[in-house]
Amino acid sequence: MFMKSIVEEALARAEREKKERIEGRGFEDVEDEILQVLHELKTVIKVIGVGGGGCNTITRMYEEGIEGAELIALNTDVQHLYYTKANRRILIGKRRTRGLGAGSLPQVGEEAARESEDEIKKLVEGSDMVFVTCGLGGGTGTGAAPVVAEAAQEAGALTIAVVTFPFSAEGAVRRANAEAGLERLREVADTVIVIPNDRLLEVVPNYPMQLAFKVADEILMRAVKGITELITKPALINLDFADVRTVMEKGGVAMIGLGEASGEDKAAESVRKALKSPLLDVDVSGAKAALVNVTGGPDMTIEEAESVIEEIYSKVDPDARIIWGAMIDPELENTMRTLIIVTGVKSPQILGRKGYPVTRKYGIDFVR
């Protein structure tokens, strides 16, 4: 009976606190000093979409809403930029491209970014974490994203690139440009999360390619939102910025797995789906680190969240560093989602059968 009354009191208190948060009460008497310290401790996170693909992803993120992150769109194509939804929109390389785009030439994209380098450096100044997102293979994203990532690194920010790798159907030139762009990003970003578009065809087979691009935007959005809101949003189990930095700093190439399940065995099923996700085209047993976001409805228990992590621990290297957080989403009644980002992986599909392309910083010409 004693334990029952404790549980009932805890549940009642949780309900009161929830109501106070919704009504905006309960903080009037917090001292100014505490508010000031909280403000100073706030992690400054910026998400920068570069080029057409990157700007499309920023629009999707803006529509979804990512708590605690500023969304910024960079492009050489003024018309595309005009229709992009973002907190800030910046036209780069005005003299080089006159707002007409990079013509699918990464060298032009890089030159445009170099022209606007001072503006880019001011953009990332004071940031703790910068996400750089783009579709590799085109002109602006492939050429300019490494310049943005380099500026973020020099500003001292944890720099995470989240990119798509082109469909085989897009042609050999685009894929060769993507490989060169990926190598440059690896040299200037802490971690590069790669979404291989070819694998999306297993997720949405027999659908138009345009839909596959929309799916890619959704996955990129979930990756950034999943990492960011574990830091910025109150959660069942929170992570702080130092936790994320531990796993993502110098993480190398990373891949992402997503799983969702409902019903009695939802915890185990969601993690199984995440680990078997077509996007996670690697042997996770050799991964050196992983970041996991477990999201469930109000009915999710700590035990369910922990069982997800136990399952992941059983699949990876015993010495791998795993950090995880758990969040509640009121819309996920009787459903759980697992997002896993595995760092330090090598994927032949992404980097060629012989391993990493042999390139050096700014020492390779993009294929025209």
UniProtKB/Swiss-Prot annotation:
* Predominant place of localization: cytoplasm
Name of the featured protein? Cell division protein FtsZ 1
Q: Which organism is it from?
A: Archaeoglobus fulgidus (strain ATCC 49558 / DSM 4304 / JCM 9628 / NBRC 100126 / VC-16)
According to its record, what are the GO cellular component terms? cell division site; cytoplasm
| Stretch forming the signal peptide | none
**Subunit record text:** Homodimer. Polymerizes to form a dynamic ring structure in a strictly GTP-dependent manner. Interacts directly with several other division proteins.
Stored NCBIfam families? ftsZ (TIGR00065)
Cross-referenced Gene3D superfamilies, in alphabetical order?
A: Tubulin/FtsZ, GTPase domain
Its GO biological process terms?
A: FtsZ-dependent cytokinesis; protein polymerization
Native organism taxonomy: Archaea, Methanobacteriati, Methanobacteriota, Archaeoglobi, Archaeoglobales
The protein's gene is named ftsZ1
Query: What is the similarity comment for this entry?
Result: Belongs to the FtsZ family.
Localization (cell): Cytoplasm
One GO MF term, please?
Answer: GTPase activity
| InterPro entries membership | Cell_div_FtsZ, Cell_div_FtsZ_CS, FtsZ/CetZ, FtsZ_C, Tub_FtsZ_C, Tubulin/FtsZ_2-layer-sand-dom, Tubulin/FtsZ_GTPase_sf, Tubulin_FtsZ_GTPase
